[in-house]
């Protein structure tokens, strides 16, 4: 299971940042990045993600047992348990799989109806969407229905409230407040006024950006709320490093972690290799830029590890894209402040973002 998940998390970590390098090459032909740099950023980020997550395993898996739904892990466990018992226990699993597969085949392949129901299909809904920018949408996919069942009513309700806030408050609100204005400071390709856009366009150009900002702020709040967890994990590591409590021989194997001494040594070694990679492979021998880069990567990756863990434990989805965008913004501002600009600065920020993004994706995946 871990081997299968590992490939997906590595790809998820790299896909948000590294393709941007090749997209920018169309505008800046002098920008070039070798495959080795792309490979190293994913490799080092993946190792850091695993090492940073281990100290928090006990908190998420043991201390918070029964309090977090862990939707994806719960679904996987139920499949394994039902399959192991066989007979009558496996029968509902097989029936559910057949029903879900048949339903998705009818919707996604045969197209008997649209997977995403929208109020635009009725006359009054189309009028409300065009005039007031009010749209009601429901994704009827079997996977979404199953996710809602797994995470429970509380967290499903919170997710729905977020959707309502975007589609029924932010989208029509922006149309009312900025009806005759062209808001294109961050995207010069936008030429329409907000009022001339459809509700879907307002969501695409502005609603998503506001949501990403919300994720970034939630990440900061998550770090603040998780500060006690972070201190506890660091204190436990320091205590063991000094020769404190060790795992008892009677401790169940599945409750044992790698020794903190090993984690500390491996983390330091990985960070040292990352620093050398930044120094000679990304920053072209500039020591100051390399030091700033490794400090940013270390602090952001470690602090956001708890946020990734919380997100996976609650909704089963890792908001790694929002946290990566925040990393890119911080990295760009800091690197420009210390003097790294131009295409070199773009490549450096994206490589650093790739390391952090892969680390967070790997931490959430495991």
State the predicted function of each range:
Residues 1-366:
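Alpha-helical multipass membrane-protein architecture
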């Amino acid at each position: 299971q871990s081997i299968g998940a590992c490939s997906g998390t590595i790809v998820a970590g790299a896909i948000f940042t590294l393709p941007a390098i090749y997209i920018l090459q169309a505008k800046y032909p002098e920008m070039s990045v070798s495959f080795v740099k792309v490979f190293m950023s994913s490799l080092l980020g993946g190792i850091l993600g695993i090492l940073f997550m281990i100290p928090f395993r006990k908190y998420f898996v043991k201390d918070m047992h029964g309090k977090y739904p862990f939707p994806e892990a719960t679904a996987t466990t139920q499949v394994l348990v039902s399959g192991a018992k066989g007979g009558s226990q496996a029968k509902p699993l097989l029936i559910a799989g057949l029903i879900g597969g048949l339903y998705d085949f009818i919707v996604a392949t045969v197209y008997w109806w649209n997977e995403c129901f929208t109020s635009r299909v009725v006359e009054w809904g189309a009028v409300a969407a065009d005039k007031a920018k009010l749209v009601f949408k429901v994704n009827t996919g079997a996977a979404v229905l199953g996710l809602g069942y797994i995470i429970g009513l509380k967290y499903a309700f919170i997710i729905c409230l977020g959707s309502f806030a975007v589609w029924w408050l932010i989208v029509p609100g922006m149309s009312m407040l900025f009806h005759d204005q062209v808001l294109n400071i961050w995207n010069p390709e936008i030429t329409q006024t907000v009022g001339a856009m459809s509700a879907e366009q307002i969501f695409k150009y502005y609603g998503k950006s506001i949501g990403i900002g919300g994720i970034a702020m939630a990440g900061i709040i998550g770090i603040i709320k998780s500060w006690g967890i972070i201190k506890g994990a660091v204190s436990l590591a320091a205590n063991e490093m000094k020769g404190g409590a060790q795992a008892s021989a009677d401790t169940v194997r599945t409750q044992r972690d790698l020794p903190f001494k090993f984690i500390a040594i491996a983390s330091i070694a990985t960070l040292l290799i990352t620093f050398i990679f930044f120094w000679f492979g990304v920053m072209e021998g500039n020591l100051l830029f390399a030091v700033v880069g490794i400090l940013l990567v270390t602090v952001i990756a470690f602090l956001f590890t708890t946020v990734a863990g919380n997100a996976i434990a609650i909704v089963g989805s890792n908001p790694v894209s929002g946290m990566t965008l925040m990393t890119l913004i911080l990295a760009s501002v800091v690197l420009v402040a210390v003097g790294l600009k131009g295409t070199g600065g773009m490549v450096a920020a994206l490589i650093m973002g790739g390391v952090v993004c892969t680390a967070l994706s790997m931490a959430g995946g495991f």
